[in-house]
């Protein structure tokens, strides 16, 4: 099961008592800020959670799995996420009891 933006908005509604429309807008705004920063080439650091980084990948050789034909995989920029130590610790602790 995955946590969705709708569930995040519902949690804000229940916890903070704000109306559902405002809660949904807050969640959307949060993610739009992250998207905008990454589109501008900025790193996103969320203290206690982790970092979103941009990484440039060079062109490399690849292969079409159906035909076996060699094809180039074009250069691109990708987003990576590195969890912070607090997040790692909490995930490991919650997984230890299972």
From Swiss-Prot:
This protein is one of the two subunits of integration host factor, a specific DNA-binding protein that functions in genetic recombination as well as in transcriptional and translational control. The gene is ihfA. Residues 49-71 are annotated as: Disordered. Keywords: DNA recombination, DNA-binding, Transcription, Transcription regulation, Translation regulation. One of its GO terms (biological process) is regulation of DNA-templated transcription. This is Integration host factor subunit alpha. InterPro entries: Hist_DNA-bd, Histone-like_DNA-bd_CS, IHF-like_DNA-bd_dom_sf, IHF_alpha. GO terms for cellular component: cytosol. It comes from Shewanella sp. (strain MR-4).
């Amino acid at each position: 099961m995955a946590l969705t933006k709708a569930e995040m908005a519902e949690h804000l509604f229940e916890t903070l008592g704000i109306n559902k429309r405002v809660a949904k807008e807050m969640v959307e705004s949060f993610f739009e800020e992250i998207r905008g920063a990454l589109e501008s080439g900025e790193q996103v650091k969320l203290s206690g959670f982790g970092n979103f980084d941009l990484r440039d990948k060079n062109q490399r050789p690849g292969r079409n799995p159906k035909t076996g034909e060699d094809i180039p995989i074009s250069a691109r920029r990708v987003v990576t996420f590195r969890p912070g130590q607090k997040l790692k610790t909490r995930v490991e602790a919650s997984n230890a009891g299972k």
